[in-house]
């Protein structure tokens, strides 16, 4: 008689009881499904019949319950169907039910143009999510101009969110073809409003969006013209060419007969003449559609690098693409103590000094031709002043004087100085007034003064106790609020002139000592300067008032401090294959490295030229 195997822990080579061998047969599920389908083919162990459209389908109750939550709920409940041998199904045809039953037993289904609609409806009703998703994927492949409108309606009716969104993207991207085929003319008002108001509407210029909206109204003017003002308000009128705005938009009867439409025309004209402060009065109409190639960009001018060399570089950053490009360099010596402001889509650099001589010169950057030109000088040479824009005019404010520049006349005029002289003041415009913040001359106490251009009068702002600033903070206006960014702290204070109230927002990611501040796209952008460890930084971070949070937006082409920054609108098409130097670029870091290389070469060339000139 053979002895049994000794499985005690003390046996040689036998593992302890704690040891185990987990086993998993990856093909088991497939073999099980195949076996169940074979039983179906052999008509064995059926325990019920489902019927639809006069066709009967013997099946296994367990298989249906395992494949569909609909059938699981039906068979597990207390309804008659839970124990019935035969169940009649409605709202589905026999052939479509046959496809779903085949899927239960095989995991396979063939979607065709003929069955996709009823199959998706049945999959939605009987809760087969993977079949429903397969139908959505098929419909997405079939999208074209002739069927996209119906597919979006169908997708939304059956809560196919992915298909609905991809179809909407297709429609927005092919709106011109839909208009050409007169498909847009049969849209409901709700749909037309949905497309016209979307930033992603793909038009080469805003004039095309106007024409499409007009085409829709004029296809049935009797029932649609009363909807025109509501549709009209979602057009980006400020970005329609001035001539076209006058000759074709304002002259259209639908527009000039509507007081509200004429009000929007005046708003667009004010924007185009730089009398409308887009940062102070945020509005969707002031945001160009990306497809037009026009973007609001951040422009960084001058500053100093890590060697404290003064820069004459001008870089621009597109937040839509995350890309940097360099613009025409400043044609003169920037020096220190200059001020920068954006008037419309032009940039003005005023004053400064070379350490021994003050400048009264004013340089204007014309963004449409990428060129710097000198305009009429200020009435007084100055440095460490402040400049800002209000009602289409450029204001320069210093401790002892205030002057104003009219770009249409290329002239300066002297205004009343501040009520109390302030050292190194910071200014911004908010709700049709100028606000200046700084320390009283020869004192440490901070005050805020306000200038009313209608009366040409300065006045003290009785705004209560000011925050404990060590230095005059940088200021910028956004949607009726003045933001004060400290130089020696990540804290940011907010003042509401309308309510005369103070508030705080979450602190910045890091400090930006000697950094720069600008408003762009409804956000605050802070860049460069020295960080918490007093290392020169290239960080660009932004604050979103809607989420009340800061986020890292990118990095400057090189670490910089004392630079100026503003935002303007400019054609800024994204680069994909070629970098600025014509060398293939895989990422933004390569772009920045190439910019720095070109800058370094240019700097060395100028340095060698100056050394040769000195000799």
Curated annotation (Swiss-Prot):
Q: Which keywords appear in this protein's UniProt record, sorted alphabetically?
A: Cell cycle, Cell division, Cytoplasm, Cytoskeleton, Kelch repeat, Mitosis, Repeat, Ubl conjugation pathway
GO MF: ubiquitin-like ligase-substrate adaptor activity
Q: Whereabouts are the Kelch repeats?
A: 297-345, 346-392, 394-432, 433-480, 482-522, 523-570
Among its keywords, does the record have Cell cycle? yes
The cross-references to Pfam families, in alphabetical order and at most eight, read: BACK (PF07707), BTB (PF00651), Kelch_1 (PF01344), Kelch_6 (PF13964)
Q: Which pathway or pathways does this protein act in?
A: Protein modification; protein ubiquitination
Q: Which residues form the BACK domain?
A: 148-249
Q: Tell me a GO biological process for this protein.
A: regulation of cytokinesis
Output the superkingdom of the source species: Eukaryota
Q: Which GO terms describe its cellular component?
A: Cul3-RING ubiquitin ligase complex; cytoplasm; polar microtubule
Protein location: Cytoplasm, Cytoskeleton, Spindle
Quote the InterPro entries the UniProt record gives. BACK (IPR011705), BTB-kelch_protein (IPR017096), BTB/POZ_dom (IPR000210), BTB/POZ_KLHL21 (IPR030577), Kelch-typ_b-propeller (IPR015915), Kelch_1 (IPR006652), KLHL21_BACK (IPR047069), SKP1/BTB/POZ_sf (IPR011333)
The answer to whether keyword Cell cycle applies is yes
The BTB domain extends over: 46-113
Subunit composition? Component of the BCR(KLHL21) E3 ubiquitin ligase complex, at least composed of cul3, klhl21 and rbx1.
Q: What does this protein do?
A: Substrate-specific adapter of BCR (BTB-CUL3-RBX1) E3 ubiquitin-protein ligase complex required for efficient chromosome alignment and cytokinesis. The BCR(KLHL21) E3 ubiquitin ligase complex regulates localization of the chromosomal passenger complex (CPC) from chromosomes to the spindle midzone in anaphase and mediates the ubiquitination of AURKB.
- State what protein this is by name: Kelch-like protein 21
